Amino acid sequence: MAKFDAHLKCSFCGKSQDQVRKLIAGPGVYICDECIDLCNEILDEELVDSQGNPRAGAEPSRKATPAAHKSNKPAPTLASIPKPLEIKSFLDQQVVGQNAAKKVMSVAVYNHYKRLAWQGDGKGETEETATRLHKSNILLIGPTGCGKTLLAQTLAEMLDVPFAVADATTLTEAGYVGEDVENILLRLLQKADMDVDQAQRGIIYIDEIDKIARKSENPSITRDVSGEGVQQALLKMLEGTVANVPPQGGRKHPYQDCIQIDTSQILFICGGAFVGLEDVVQKRMGRNAIGFMPPADSRGRSRANRDLQAAQVLRNLEPDDLVKYGLIPEFIGRIPVSAVLEPLDEKTLESILTEPRDALVKQFRTLLSMDNVQLQFADDAITAIAQEAHRRKTGARALRGIIEEIMLDLMYDLPSQSSVKDFTVTRSMVEEHTGGKVLPLPGTDQQKTA
């Protein structure tokens, strides 16, 4: 269009000109580029006649998607399911700390896959006296970088099942701009190589679930398409339903072939930081938030101590507290198992650097060993890195960023210095680099004067 006018709107979706890339005018009507794309998708669907042959003039769809299929891989048996102690032992190899959360998840996951084995044996259907086993989804509550996603990912790795991660903040209610909840299932299906049976036994982790809380516990009189609306859309999926998943993603339309996935066997793990939830719990318990957990400047308590106290308060969490926070009762009822993860202190961060199977220190040692350099980290350097990560308040995620900063110049210079066979990162190097100074490199004048 020759002239921009914010008052002009698409006659089909109602978006104004400043919300779309292109708005095309017709005799008394307007259509935006997004609606044109949707029309093209509908028209591009392969049209067939009553005999199943392509209709004359019909063109195949532009996007070729792999066909969904069912595998011959047998369902898990009771004997093949690892016991809770075995599950926790495996988690200990990858995740440091969080013992209470590991125990909760080990039991919940064991019971979930026992339920699948029970159904696979047909006992739940043939025995009249058999008790119906309902699934128990899991809610993880903890600050950023404390290991929520890693716990879920490690479980899926141990059980050898497909695993998908979704961000709740991108989801919207059907009919609005954003992702439909069915797109979560598409990610899981893609992780399973379009194997429907495998996907139906997988694990889905929905992150940032606290961001879809409604603004108050009272039902909203206005449309909340990314909060309460998403919670409502997730209800059936969490409980168990046969969902129609568009194989190409995006919005569903009437002429699109969809893949049907039964979600009753999928384990959903929801996680979020739930900032401020401890205040809701304290209010219910009748404790003054300021007096019970004073700010750092009033009593000299550190922020770390406050975070630890918040985790201790959340041990008294009740479903009604989550309702007051903004989750609807129906949503909470479909996630009956909850676990509170504690914030990571400096000692735990030190352990994360060195102890897990894929610890960061081991990763960088392996990288430099390919250049015939034996890399070592002094104990006080490990402590300094953990202290800096703790100061940044982003949990274990800060560790990789700090080491990458420290090692950047080293990894740039060392491969070209064949005479250097070993190198030790010291505390002074960590402190100098995190303070903005250049890290001395081996064989340079800067190192000789240090």
From Swiss-Prot:
Gene3D superfamilies: 1.10.8.60, ClpX chaperone, C4-type zinc finger domain (6.20.220.10), P-loop containing nucleotide triphosphate hydrolases (3.40.50.300). One of its GO terms (molecular function) is ATP binding. One of its GO terms (biological process) is proteolysis involved in protein catabolic process. ATP binds at P143, T144, G145, C146, G147, K148, T149, L150. Residues 50-78 are annotated as: Disordered. Keywords: ATP-binding, Chaperone, Metal-binding, Nucleotide-binding, Zinc. Zn(2+) binds at C10, C13, C32, C35. One of its GO terms (cellular component) is HslUV protease complex. Residues 1-51 form the ClpX-type ZB domain. SUPFAM superfamilies: Glucocorticoid receptor-like (DNA-binding domain), P-loop containing nucleoside triphosphate hydrolases. The keyword Metal-binding applies. The keyword Ribonucleoprotein does not apply. Component of the ClpX-ClpP complex. Forms a hexameric ring that, in the presence of ATP, binds to fourteen ClpP subunits assembled into a disk-like structure with a central cavity, resembling the structure of eukaryotic proteasomes. Belongs to the ClpX chaperone family. HAMAP family: ClpX. This is ATP-dependent Clp protease ATP-binding subunit ClpX. It comes from Synechococcus sp. (strain CC9902). The lineage of its organism: Bacteria, Bacillati, Cyanobacteriota, Cyanophyceae, Synechococcales. The gene is clpX.
